[in-house]
Design a protein with these regions (language model features):
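A generic structural signal for short hydrophobic patches within well-formed alpha-helices
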Residues: 231-232
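Ordered, small/hydrophobic-rich secondary-structure cores
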Residues: 1-67
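Short, well-ordered beta-strand micro-motif
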Residues: 74-76, 122, 200-204, 224-227
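Acidic, metal-coordinating catalytic segment for phosphate/diphosphate chemistry
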Residues: 1-9, 58-121
Length: 253
């Protein structure tokens, strides 16, 4: 896994299952699906439906002085009531920073890239959806993508999304509910192995402006507002397909 730059915190991801007033937790290792980690923690069947409850950003130091950036992803069984966030009050969540201080012992056979990314299903008062187009030279070049991207070391997951929306589209969005959590893991023989955890939030832009890219020499070539009918005719990135498919399944008729 690519090591952090000098002075940057070590990155960790944990997954948690809220059952009533109890919170179970486990470390998410490279390549693991957070939802599968949670099902294993709770002794649930592989087909058990889960709902994403929350994502927490924790910036701490381990007892040995190691700075840690922990992204904690919280789930509950679909259709159940969960005492969140009161279930997390008082004692800290497990695994603790002490338990997370050690790095992973991964094979050294290839470069590995790990990413925790936050994306928005962004809309405005008229129901149009905000998308950004990936620039040439980046994975998925030319496809339309959800505004968002990697969470920087030391950055809160929601603050990162609001920043990305502003940089990629010129909009001031309010980050709302967590919608779903997904993971992506792929590798090529002799090439990099890439692993990412994607979290998707609803973002509302109360006062939409014409979309324009503010970042320079970045991964975004263009951005724009689209009706749902127009979105159906666009070539979408894998991330956008996954996030918009979730919305299509869960939107009210």
């Amino acid at each position: 896994v690519t090591p952090p730059s000098p002075g940057e915190p070590q990155r960790r991801v944990t997954a948690h299952l809220v059952t009533g007033s109890t919170v179970l937790g486990g470390r998410v290792l490279f390549g693991q699906d957070p939802a599968e980690v949670v099902r294993d923690l709770g002794g649930l069947s592989p087909n058990t439906s889960l709902r994403a409850v929350d994502v927490l950003t924790e910036l701490v130091e381990a007892p040995d002085g190691t700075p840690l950036h922990i992204d904690r992803v919280v789930f509950a069984e679909a259709g159940t009531r969960a005492a969140w966030p009161s279930a997390a009050a008082g004692s800290g969540l497990s695994p603790s920073p002490t338990e997370l201080a050690a790095g992973e012992d991964l094979p050294q056979d290839r470069p590995r890239l790990r990413r925790f990314a936050s994306y928005g299903i962004v809309d405005g008062p008229d129901g149009r959806v905000l998308l950004s187009r990936i620039a040439e030279g980046f994975p998925g070049a030319g496809t339309w993508h959800l505004p968002g991207g990697g969470v920087d070391a030391g950055e809160d997951v929601r603050a990162a999304l609001r920043r990305e929306v502003a940089e990629e589209t010129g909009q001031d969005g309010q980050v709302g509910d967590l919608l779903t959590v997904s993971s992506h893991h792929r590798g090529q023989p002799g090439g990099h192995e890439i692993y990412a955890v994607w979290v998707f939030f609803h973002v509302f832009v109360a006062s939409p402006r014409p979309a324009r890219v503010l970042e320079e020499n970045g991964s975004t070539a263009d951005s724009g507002w689209f009706t749902p009918e127009e979105v159906a005719g666009l070539r979408l990135s894998a991330t956008a397909q996954r996030g918009l498919a979730y919305m299509a399944r869960h939107s009210r008729p």
